[in-house]
């Protein structure tokens, strides 16, 4: 009977995995057009909805919306969505415009604009504090780290999570630095504050007068309250979605809080990769747009808001990430006059670091090669993980319920003297397992700090990836409860 109870959960897991492997899949094996790719993969990847725009040969070749937002309202290509960390490319464009107009210099200490920041001590990753003022170039290039705890005025309630690099090795190297993380989400908020100080105008007014109005981006703004019908963001939980009704704070605009649409971003990206002859915006002529995606340092990986990765295949220029309820991925190919942008009403580490990059990669294959292979069906894997997790929880609940019989049987071994060593090993294993589970739960925010470069609360851990975070946390806690109940029963039985 005990053996049967032991193998039943594993049999259920095997059945679920086999069903997932052999059930018919959706869509063709290969995609040859953008519409079938994004229509099918939205379902296969478990994404609530997204807007897509693609620039090819300097023209807007594709612009469509699929799915729905957190409240299941259908998305359209003109539905406003939060841009998240990709807001940096618009702030970077403003900075470039100010530099071109000689209103500001990149190598000037930021304390010249905001004296309160004069005491800010910056340092390179793994190095001691730099004995020099922090400059605007260093800030815009994410060149140095600085103590975020000393900047409460620039740290709103909602913080974005910048997407990782396309190469796994580069992703790990950039997200697990030797000491301090340089890509602070506060960097471009400070840049935005400096632009306001220099111009004596609000950031939202600068964005409108210098970028959005000249380019006809009428639904792009740093003042979300000025736009109606912004899509409600969503979170994900094992392939299912739930709505977020909480809005992103206004003061996050310069780095995380700009609202836009795929239609508007298509206009902006078209200007960036292939502006029409003579097409200018204040401080940025059509011939100057390549400045936007040139590294601010020769050995750097960041331009005016853009991230730049050099590889054997050439430069990979991108930006994106997640903020509560929303994610985005933007990639440009300036040498080919092409660009891809995906905006989605759903957040999470998985969607911003894996799913959206995968979809961009597939679209890139169609764009340049005419065909793309069908990617891995993530939603199916998430549903399998959800069922396995449920079975695991049920097994742990049963083990907690049967703690008395477990302790009684263990003490019988000891009383009969048949296996004293076995009893001791079981008790030691139970205690160590309990301590390890508690330690992992307590240290989870510390591990997240190493990953994202800033202190992370338990609430944020669950918000950025509800399925995985809640699964791991619940599994650890239920395992700890099981061990506690077993140890308590052993103590009670020994006393009686």
Predicted regions and their residues:
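Stable alpha-helical elements in mature extracytoplasmic
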Residues: 30, 34-37, 50, 86-87, ...
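Short, surface-exposed loop or secondary-structure junction motifs
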Residues: 122-324
């Amino acid at each position: 009977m005990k053996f049967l109870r032991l193998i039943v959960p594993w049999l259920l897991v095997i059945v679920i995995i086999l069903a997932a492997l052999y059930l018919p899949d959706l869509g063709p094996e290969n995609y040859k057009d953008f519409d079938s790719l994004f229509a099918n993969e939205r379902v296969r990847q478990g994404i609530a909805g997204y807007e897509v725009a693609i620039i090819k040969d300097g023209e807007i070749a594709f612009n469509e919306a699929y799915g729905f937002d957190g409240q299941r309202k259908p998305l359209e290509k003109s539905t406003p969505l939060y841009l998240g960390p990709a807001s940096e490319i618009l702030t970077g464009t403003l900075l470039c415009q100010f530099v071109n107009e000689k209103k500001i210099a990149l190598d000037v200490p930021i304390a010249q604009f905001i004296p309160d920041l004069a005491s800010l001590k910056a340092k390179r990753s793994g190095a001691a504090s730099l004995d020099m003022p922090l400059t605007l170039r260093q800030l815009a290039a994410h060149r140095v780290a600085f103590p975020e705890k000393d900047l409460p005025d620039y740290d709103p309630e909602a913080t974005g999570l910048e997407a990782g690099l396309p190469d796994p090795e580069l992703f790990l190297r950039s997200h697990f630095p030797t000491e301090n993380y340089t890509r602070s989400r506060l960097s471009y908020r400070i840049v935005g504050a400096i632009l306001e100080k220099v111009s004596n105008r609000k950031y939202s007014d600068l964005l409108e007068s210098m970028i959005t109005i000249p380019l006809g981006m009428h639904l792009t703004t740093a003042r979300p309250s000025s736009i109606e019908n912004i899509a409600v963001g969503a979170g994900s939980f094992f392939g299912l979605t739930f709505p977020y009704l909480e809005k992103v704070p206004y003061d996050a605009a310069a780095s995380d809080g700009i609202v836009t649409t795929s239609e508007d971003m298509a206009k902006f990206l078209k200007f960036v990769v292939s502006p029409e002859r003579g097409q200018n915006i204040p401080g940025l002529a059509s011939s100057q747009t390549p400045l936007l995606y040139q590294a601010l340092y020769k050995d750097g990986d960041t331009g005016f808001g853009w991230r730049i990765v050099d590889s054997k295949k050439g430069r990979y220029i991108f930006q994106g990430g997640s903020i509560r309820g929303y994610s985005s991925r933007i990639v440009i190919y300036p040498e080919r006059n092409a660009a891809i942008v995906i905006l989605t009403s759903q957040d999470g580490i998985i969607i911003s670091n894996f799913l959206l990059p995968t979809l961009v990669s597939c679209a890139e294959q169609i764009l340049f090669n005419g065909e793309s292979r069908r990617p891995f069906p993530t939603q199916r894997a998430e549903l399998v993980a959800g069922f396995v997790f449920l079975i695991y929880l049920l097994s742990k609940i049963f083990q907690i319920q049967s703690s008395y019989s477990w302790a009684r049987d263990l003490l019988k071994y000891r009383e009969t003297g048949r296996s004293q060593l076995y009893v001791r090993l079981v008790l030691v294993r139970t205690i160590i397992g309990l301590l390890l589970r508690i330690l992992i739960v307590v240290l989870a925010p510390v591990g997240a700090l190493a990953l994202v470069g800033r202190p992370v609360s338990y609430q944020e851990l669950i918000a950025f990836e509800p399925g995985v975070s809640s699964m791991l946390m619940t599994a650890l806690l239920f395992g700890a409860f099981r061990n506690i109940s077993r140890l308590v029963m052993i103590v009670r039985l020994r006393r009686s």
